[in-house]
């Protein structure tokens, strides 16, 4: 089988310039990208390969975030259930939460935006019956009903972006300042973000593709006090909130917002729940507003003659690609992480873009690429799991991310990825103009509809 070239994106960094050139040839890659924690080398600007630049709309600008603390991104958190054994109950808000990630928001009216609920009866506790002691971080409920369970739902600022925190923990980055997540939806930050994007484009004239990561709200990702993942919901909306946003929502729907619309008894409206009317109203509002703002950024990128690509993950809430609002944004491409065939179909089925790209696993991080690790096995499982989905709904490109120098320490892995790249190109060429045979046997109906297709 003769070798072909193209349709592959590889990562690079300042310390792997010759190796990047070698991998461009060996894997037949035609595009190079930077990643979180890496820099694009000036020496690779004129290789002839397409250049992707990762762009973070909501972080990597701590100076701005610190100067505008009121416009830091927020999320709703619910405490664990606490049982009252007397007429007074104290609940510490930050129990089992990573202290550097979140800061309790007392700037906005807590009696308006927080909620204490008697989970035994399901009723909200009157704001006259609870108070917050900012010194010790406790909510005090008085009078509490003995042996009833209580929770507190509160707003917290995201002082360490969850994705940046994950990357820092996994890679054991030392002396790295936590990146604060700012809220692009708010007025001052919105104007600043458009200027910031233009400055980025002015200084990155060599870039062909702006790889947005992403627009503009992080999926629900919370860490415990030991920096372990405490709660993850890739579809979660709990970090897409602020009083500024919620007041706009209230004006549109004509009823008062409650934190419980998001908290949902602690289930956070996950995929296995039946969503309330209020939560679905909130999603409609968020999708429209996020799409409107994303289109502004995409239009700026097009103005500079570059392609706009969205990474389908991280801060992607409100950008659900199977909904009508997505088509209005005008993106050129979507790239998604390939966990299996279902997650590949999540973006390979997307319409209204010129091409889709699968970022295959393993990511070149030390949690896999370490002494005793077996990245080749993980790569084989990932490729074989996703390959059939490519035949049924083709993607146009594949790629990898992370630290290339780690991958190069595993020659068997490097050789296997060479085979994967070649096999993908053969599959891509052979399936053009064909329609896979499919016997339709099962239809799945759920409350979420097409919004969570393949979810």
What are these regions (language model features)?
Residues 69-328, 346:
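Polysaccharide-binding and catalytic clefts of secreted carbohydrate-active enzymes
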Residues 27, 44, 63-68, 197-198, ...:
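Hydrophobic targeting/anchoring helices
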Residues 10-14, 47-49, 79, 91:
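Long, contiguous N-terminal structural blocks used for assembly/anchoring
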Residues 14-39, 49, 54, 71:
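Long, solvent-exposed N-terminal ectodomains/accessory regions
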Residues 36, 50-56, 313, 338, ...:
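Proline- and acidic/polar-enriched loop/turn elements at helix boundaries
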């Amino acid at each position: 089988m003769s070798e072909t070239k193209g349709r592959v994106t590889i990562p690079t960094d300042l310390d792997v310039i010759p190796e990047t050139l070698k991998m461009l040839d060996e894997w037949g890659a035609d595009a190079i990208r930077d990643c979180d924690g890496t820099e694009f080398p000036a020496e690779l600007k004129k290789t002839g390969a397409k250049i992707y630049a990762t762009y973070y709309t909501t972080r990597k600008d701590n100076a701005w975030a610190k100067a505008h603390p009121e416009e830091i991104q927020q999320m709703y958190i619910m405490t664990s259930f606490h049982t009252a054994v007397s007429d007074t109950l104290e609940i510490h808000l930050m129990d089992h939460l990573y202290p550097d990630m979140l800061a309790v928001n007392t700037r906005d009216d807590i009696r308006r935006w927080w909620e204490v609920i008697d989970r035994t009866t399901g009723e909200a506790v009157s704001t006259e019956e609870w108070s917050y002691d900012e010194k010790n971080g406790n909510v005090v409920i008085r009078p509490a009903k003995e042996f009833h369970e209580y929770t507190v739902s509160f707003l917290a600022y995201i002082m360490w972006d969850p994705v940046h925190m994950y990357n820092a923990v996994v890679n054991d980055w030392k002396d790295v300042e936590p990146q604060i997540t700012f809220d692009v939806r708010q007025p001052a930050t919105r104007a600043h973000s458009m200027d910031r994007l233009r400055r980025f484009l002015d200084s990155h004239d060599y870039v062909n593709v702006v790889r947005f990561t992403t627009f503009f709200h992080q999926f629900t990702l919370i860490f415990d006090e030991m920096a372990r993942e405490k709660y993850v919901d890739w579809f979660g909306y709990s970090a897409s909130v602020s009083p500024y946003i919620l007041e706009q929502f209230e004006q549109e729907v004509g009823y008062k917002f409650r934190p419980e619309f998001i908290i949902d008894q602690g289930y956070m409206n996950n995929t296995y729940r039946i969503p309330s009317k209020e939560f679905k109203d909130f999603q409609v509002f968020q999708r429209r507003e996020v799409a409107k703002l994303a289109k502004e950024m995409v239009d700026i990128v097009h103005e500079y003659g570059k392609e706009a690509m969205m990474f389908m993950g991280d801060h992607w809430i409100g950008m659900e690609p199977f909904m009508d609002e997505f088509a209005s944004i005008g993106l050129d491409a979507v790239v998604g992480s390939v966990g299996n065939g279902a997650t590949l179909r999540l973006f390979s089925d997307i319409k209204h873009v010129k091409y889709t790209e699968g970022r295959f696993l393993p990511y070149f991080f030390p949690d896999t690429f370490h002494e005793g690790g077996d990245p080749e096995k993980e790569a084989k499982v990932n490729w074989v799991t996703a390959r059939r989905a490519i035949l049924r709904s083709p993607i146009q490109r594949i790629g990898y991310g992370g630290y290339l120098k780690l991958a190069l320490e595993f020659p068997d892995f490097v050789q296997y990825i060479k085979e994967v790249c070649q096999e993908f190109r053969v599959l891509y060429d052979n399936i053009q103009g064909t329609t896979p045979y499919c016997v339709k046997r099962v239809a799945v109906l759920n409350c979420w509809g097409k919004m969570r297709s393949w979810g």
